[in-house]
């Protein structure tokens, strides 16, 4: 995905305010061996780009005024407190030979044909909507698919139940290497978990 940028030499709060009044957005590109690059973006262009999922989870081609192109990854966006206005954007340079640490969205499919929904009338709870991963830039997926087609009422799907793309590894947090991804919650019941069996045992 491509977007346009213009290098800027003037920095500081007052300069940033002037840019915003002119319909521009201050931004920065950092990482790699080159020095950080201060840039400005057209507000309307970046606003609409940020509404697209792929802009958040893809290698982006930044075209700097004059024709130079750099591959970057979106890192953070600062929004106005109450207006739909982009205040600042951070991008990171991409090195084809260095692994990326980023987050990618999960796409859930086939929920409507699963036994959980068709037979049990369950509500599918998406416990996670994205995964924290590491991979080389060339292997970065735009999303990871989670097939719910075989999910039963009261059942659940963990990370071990889905197949990660080749070359992609999950970054565990807090020692949880197999987090809960989705659960089929049945009205008046719930999703099955490891504590259910223990709870049903009579007291000694």
Curated annotation (Swiss-Prot):
Coiled coil: none annotated. InterPro entries: Rbsml_bL25/Gln-tRNA_synth_N (IPR020056), Ribosomal_bL25/Gln-tRNA_synth (IPR011035), Ribosomal_bL25_b-dom (IPR020057), Ribosomal_bL25_C (IPR037121), Ribosomal_bL25_long (IPR001021), Ribosomal_bL25_short (IPR020055), Ribosomal_L25_dom (IPR029751), Ribosomal_uL5_bac-type (IPR020930). One of its GO terms (cellular component) is cytosolic large ribosomal subunit. Pfam families: Ribosomal_L25p, Ribosomal_TL5_C. One of its GO terms (molecular function) is 5S rRNA binding. GO terms for biological process: translation. The keyword Nucleotide-binding does not apply. Keywords: Ribonucleoprotein, Ribosomal protein, RNA-binding, rRNA-binding. Transmembrane segments: none annotated. NCBIfam families: bL25_bact_ctc, PRK05618.1-5, PRK05943.1. Belongs to the bacterial ribosomal protein bL25 family. CTC subfamily. This is one of the proteins that binds to the 5S RNA in the ribosome where it forms part of the central protuberance. Part of the 50S ribosomal subunit; part of the 5S rRNA/L5/L18/L25 subcomplex. Contacts the 5S rRNA. Binds to the 5S rRNA independently of L5 and L18. This is Large ribosomal subunit protein bL25.
């Amino acid at each position: 995905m491509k977007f346009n940028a213009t290098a800027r030499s003037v920095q500081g709060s007052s300069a940033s305010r002037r840019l915003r009044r002119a319909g521009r957005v201050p931004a920065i590109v950092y990482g790699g061996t080159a020095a950080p690059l201060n840039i400005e973006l057209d507000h309307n262009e970046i606003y609409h780009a940020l509404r697209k999922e792929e802009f958040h989870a893809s290698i982006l081609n930044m075209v700097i005024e004059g024709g130079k192109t750099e591959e970057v990854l979106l890192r953070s966006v600062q929004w106005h407190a109450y207006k739909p206005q982009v205040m600042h954007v951070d991008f990171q340079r991409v090195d084809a030979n260095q692994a990326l640490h980023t987050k990618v969205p999960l796409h859930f499919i086939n929920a409507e044909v699963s036994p959980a929904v068709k037979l049990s009338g369950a509500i599918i709870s998406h416990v996670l909507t994205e995964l924290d991963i590491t991979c080389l830039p060339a292997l970065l997926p735009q999303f990871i698919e989670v097939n719910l087609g075989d999910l039963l009422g009261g059942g659940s799907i963990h990370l071990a139940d889905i197949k990660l793309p080749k070359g992609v590894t999950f970054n565990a947090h807090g020692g949880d290497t197999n987090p809960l991804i989705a659960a089929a919650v049945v009205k008046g019941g719930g999703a099955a978990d490891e504590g259910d069996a223990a709870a049903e045992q009579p007291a000694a």
